[in-house]
Amino acid sequence: MSKIKDDVKKQIEKRRTFAIISHPDAGKTTLTEKFLLYGGAINQAGSVKGKATSKHAVSDWMEIEKERGISVTSSVLQFNYGGYCINILDTPGHQDFSEDTYRTLMAADSAVMVIDASKGVEAQTRKLFKVCTMRHIPIFTFINKMDREAMDTFELLDDIENELGIATCPVNWPIGSGKEFRGVYDRATKSVELFSDTRKGTTQGEVQIVPIDDPSLNGLISEEQKAKLEEEIELQDGAGAELDQEMVSKGELSPVFFGSALTNFGVETFLKHFLKMTTSPLPRKSDKGEIDPMEEGEFSAFVFKIQANMNKAHRDRIAFMRICSGEFEAGMDVFHMQGGKKVRLSQPQQMMASERHMVDKAYGGDIIGVFDPGIFSIGDTLTTSSDKFSYEGIPTFAPEHFARVRQVDTMKRKQFIKGINQIAQEGAIQIFQEFNTGMEEIVVGVVGVLQFDVLKYRLENEYNVDIRLENLPYEYIRWIDNPQDFDLAKLSGTSDMKKVKDLKDRPLLLFVNEWSIRMTQERNDGLVLTEFAR
């Protein structure tokens, strides 16, 4: 381990790397775009929904995302604002892609949770919040869509605390909602921030700041709004939790902000507060203990995402890695721990969704993409340290839906095998082979059924292969942990059990129900089954 240089440390201290999570349609992608607008990364914000002639969201780059208006992959976006270098990881909102979201959260130091003001905490928010708590990262809440009819502010805060089990502390307070949404009250400065027209959110707009006790405020908001604001603030100040930065850092208390991403109201206010309150890159667990980016001078990173064919013209494969320590330089040689050899990281690039630009240098906290000739896997560690180590692995979700997949045109077998293998290596699907059949019979497992649609779409559009999917009745998957103790051909199970193997030749069993699992274990004394591959 080598000591960090002062100039590298200063660069790392500027980094803020966070993920944005939400239930579908809470406004996550719109909020991401507005951050880019304020950071000067785009001149005019597009909207996810709208007329066919409208721009598509900057972070939705895959064709199927543009067609459906949902994010099905995690986009990586970088921009500068207020002296900070910001890396945003925009995650899929749809529950069928929760595995991709989990991997993305592994690369984040904090999370922004977007909640629809009219609906409160929704199903997918709960699931994603659980993943955040497993990582013990700070969680900041942006209550969105205040320009529409909203739940009572106290009800929203109670909903977050009761549903998610986390304390809340509103940093600001909304003034009205729906058509009467005028701005927010900043509790720290005791001033009101009033928002101007932003041309339906396509431009930044101006903010007028007025102290709460300034007489001029009476002409800017109604007497009723002012009286209600003063009453609610008095109640909150008397009964609410104080803003405890240590609790925030541990993920035990969530600072809450209100606004409207669509109209830009409250977005820049949130961004400014968030960047000051959130953390610079955090230490990471490895098999040699924690690696602290503020102390470790050697370069280290781990792969959290692999994506093929981001641009049809390139036909390449990019491995996205989170730099955890040190300084990256283009063309540098690093040791690939899982491959057991040195590799050169070529064509390093940073992304604005599908737009890419080459980078010469990057630092701890940054996300970069490098050309992958097919040697990297999700969770791999790369380092220049002579004291070699591996970062904690990224677990694989057990698939819950299965289908047999065949290509329609037998002459396109080569493209089919290449395509399905590449998509599997990205972690979007898991593929299994039946015993003694090679790749003739392929079974695909996914966490959510929408992933089958994405698989079909991508094979057709990126590899020019039409496929047929035959849904299978299996719901449970178990890897055999001790295959050396059994003759797998003679393994006795229920009639609806299926024997398959994964891409690493590890044997596993598919079951229709839990009864079949119990019966198989009873008939094969000593058989050890696990939900995850080891």
Q: Which functions belong to the PLM regions below?
A:
Residues 1-534:
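Structural and coupling elements of P-loop NTPases
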